[in-house]
Amino acid sequence: TGKKPSNINLLVDKDANRPKILRALKLWLPKVGGENRDIYLFFAGHGLASDDGKNLYILPQDGDASLLEDTAIKRSEIVKLLQKTNPKSVTMFFDTCYSGQTRNEETLVANLRPVRIVADEQNMPNNFTVFTASANDQTSGSINEAKQGMFSYYLMKGLEGKADENKDKQITNHEMIAYLKTNVSKEAFMQNREQDPMLSGDPDQVLMKY
C-alpha cells in the first residue's frame, strides 16, 4: 500500500548530511511516527566499522571516513532513536557495506587495516527487521546501467511484486530475502565477486501487501 507524502522524509545528495539525518530521526519522526506505527528506513551510501569491529557506522554526505565518531552516525544510535518512538515495527534497508571499500572496490580510507566485524545483528529489538546489501566482509556493488546499487535495484523490483513467490498479493521477509539473494548473488557473480544480502528479523512477517 502507498504511504502519504507527508509521512515520507526524502534526503538525497547534499541533503543527506549528518545534521539533516539526525533532525529527521530526532524531530520529524516523533511527530509523524507516533506510537504503534510501522516505520521504514532506507539508506544507500557508504558504511564503515570502528577499528575494533564492534560498531557499524553509516557515512552521511558530509561525513569524513577518518573521523567516524565525529562525522558519521552509529547504526546503534539510529536504532535507539527509532525505539524512542514506540513503533509497532521497524524495517530498515541498508544498501551499504562495512568493508571500507566503495562500490568500485576503492579504499575509503588510505592505509585502511582489515577489520574483523563482530557487531551482532541479533541484538536488534524483536520488532525490528534489517535487510542489508551484503555480508559484513563483502563489498556492495552497483549496476552501472541502472545507475544504482545492485541491492537497491532488486529491492525495488521485489517491492513491485517480483518477490511475491506464491502470488498471494503480499510479500513476506522470507520471500524478499530469497528474491534478493538469488538475483543479487547472481549479478555479483557476473562481476566476478561475491555479494549475499542478509536478513535479521522474523522471516514470516509480512513486509507489504499490494
Predicted regions and their residues:
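Extracellular S/T/G-rich loop segment that most often corresponds to the catalytic His/Ser-adjacent loop
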Residues: V90-Y153
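Caspase-like (clan CD) cysteine peptidase catalytic core
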Residues: P19-A44, L48-T107
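Caspase-like cysteine protease fold
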Residues: A163-Y210
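Short glycine/serine- and small hydrophobic-enriched flexible loop segments
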Residues: M156-G161
